[in-house]
């Protein structure tokens, strides 16, 4: 969801990105209720590692959201999630490259239109 929230406003630009790179860090609470050696918080408290870097289960959802709402297709996308030494939270950085970069004003309008009352993008 965090990656989709970052990308959704950019659909309004009606431009197909050349490349999208999504870098996500997730806490141990997102790994589910069953403790495992790689996901249980006490065992990963001082660890930081990539999680399914080339075949993440949320990548199709991100592509589907963009394709359904934008009319264009995401053909060149990289999604890497890391398990961070956090209990809760997801931190996402999204890098979107266009052949002609949008102006700062265009970007602000897109994001404000989608999230007018939330300080999410401030």
Put a short name on every predicted segment.
Residues 18-122:
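C-terminal substrate-binding/catalytic lobe of Rossmann-fold NAD(P)-dependent oxidoreductases
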Residues 1-15, 22:
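Alpha-helical support elements that line or immediately flank enzyme active sites
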